[in-house]
Amino acid sequence: MNLLITKDEENDTLGFFFEKCSDIVSAIFENSSNIKLLSSQKLKNDIIFSMTVSDPAFVPFNFFAFTHGNEDGLIVNNQNYVGCNWNAEYWTDANLVYNYSCLSALQFGKYAIKQGANCFVGHNKAIKVQTLPKYENYFIEPLKKFMLALSENKNVRESVNQAKIQYTDEIDSLYMTDMFTASVLLENRDSLVCYGNAEIIL
């Protein structure tokens, strides 16, 4: 399995979180995948991204992004490195496109499917992360559950459901003691959507 992971570890607010997420995913898939990792500096160079996804030896590929996002696509250094209305050819050979990014499901996810990606998973609203260390795992565990399910040959639909169940477990554990964090997790859970063929197995 070919897996492209992007991370914006240099981001001032969430760089450490994006890096931790990418490290967890890399560890889960390291024994079963051909992984290419593009970090902040490489994402600032359009040519590097283009060469990676157009490499004939790297298709089909799965794409997991841990960067900021907007309706049109994914962001590094306040600029889109992928998005709607350009680089349509990138997604012709994409299997699963997953974004841990704000808003990218609104337009970009649908665009990726239209251009040929088999499946997209991401958020249709702005997502929030509590950055204090004591809260970190509440936000990471649903991601981990999703990725572990994929690695165990569950289809995307079931894997998303596993992530949402984990979100609910985290919410329930906080509901009586920290209503604010529980409400943030609830919003993140409910904004997680899936487009395309959710029956695919990686």
Task: Name these PLM-found stretches.
Residues 17-25, 46-50, 77-85, 139, ...:
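Well-ordered, non-membrane alpha-helical segments in soluble/globular domains
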Residues 105-202:
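Active-site-proximal C-terminal subdomain of hydrolase catalytic domains
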Residues 56-57, 90-92, 113:
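Extracellular/periplasmic catalytic domains that process cell-envelope and extracellular macromolecules
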